[in-house]
């Protein structure tokens, strides 16, 4: 009896074809998923400034923006007043603020290079008494950002006289005050914000001051 002989014919491997197809698809998917750097959207948390700040760096601007109320997010910053352009005068600051209604960021650098200031829920103006809301806060970069929010103990947010500007008060002390010449100022712990002294010393000299309208 003749032995049976079998002939094996190798058929194309479906597994290999499938794997080969999958590898090709993966390459196509990877190519399609590659991001286009030029099309990357701008970071929505970084506000747009009408001009460069002489006091705040880009990193400091970004850090501060996280502490603003939601109604301010996305609004550009407009430089309403700066001492290098408008001079050292509180009355000039008031004049530049006339007609403004939105919140304001007041930021300054003192003779020691310390950067600090305040966020006011409304424009800075002359007033017979204190005004503002609980959105108002004080801040300091020392060198890391520290923010001092409203404690709820009183409503002494902002008060503007002809010869001084005060923010936060209680027991005869002010969280931040500036004189009429915008040359000298002071900072003390106050009940409104339970803040630390914003500068290295309670009394300081102003080197540069900016007021930004955030609306």
Swiss-Prot record:
Family stated for the protein in its record: Belongs to the OXR1 family.
UniProt cross-references to PANTHER family, sorted A to Z: NUCLEOLAR PROTEIN 7/ESTROGEN RECEPTOR COACTIVATOR-RELATED (PTHR23354), TLD DOMAIN-CONTAINING PROTEIN 2 (PTHR23354:SF65)
Family annotation (Pfam families): TLD (PF07534)
Gene Ontology terms: cellular component: nucleus
Gene that encodes the chain: TLDC2
Domain TLDc: 54-215
Top-level division of the source organism's lineage: Eukaryota
Entry-linked PROSITE patterns: TLDC (PS51886)
Protein name, as recorded: TLD domain-containing protein 2
Composition bias type Acidic residues, residue spans: 19-34
Annotated segments matching region Disordered: 1-46
InterPro entries for the chain: TLDc_dom
Gene Ontology biological process terms in this record: response to oxidative stress
């Amino acid at each position: 009896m003749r032995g049976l002989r079998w002939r094996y014919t190798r058929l194309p491997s479906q597994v290999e074809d499938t794997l080969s197809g999958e590898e090709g698809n993966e390459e196509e998917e990877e190519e399609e998923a590659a991001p286009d750097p030029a099309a990357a959207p701008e970071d929505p948390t970084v506000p747009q400034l009408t001009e460069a700040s002489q006091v705040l760096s880009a990193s400091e601007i970004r850090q501060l923006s996280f502490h603003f109320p939601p109604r301010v997010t996305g609004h550009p910053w407009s430089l309403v007043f700066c001492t290098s352009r408008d001079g050292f005068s509180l009355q000039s600051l008031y004049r530049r603020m006339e007609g403004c209604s939105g919140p304001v960021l007041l930021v300054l650098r003192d003779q020691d290079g310390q950067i600090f200031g305040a966020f006011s829920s409304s424009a800075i103006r002359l007033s017979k008494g204190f005004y503002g809301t609980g959105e108002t806060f004080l801040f300091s970069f020392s060198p890391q950002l520290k923010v001092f929010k409203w404690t709820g103990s009183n409503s002494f947010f902002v008060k503007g006289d002809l010869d001084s500007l005060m923010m936060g008060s209680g027991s005869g002390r002010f969280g931040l005050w500036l004189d009429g010449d915008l040359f000298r100022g002071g900072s003390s712990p106050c009940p409104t914000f339970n803040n630390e002294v914003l500068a290295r010393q309670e009394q300081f000299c102003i080197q540069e001051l900016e007021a930004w309208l955030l609306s």
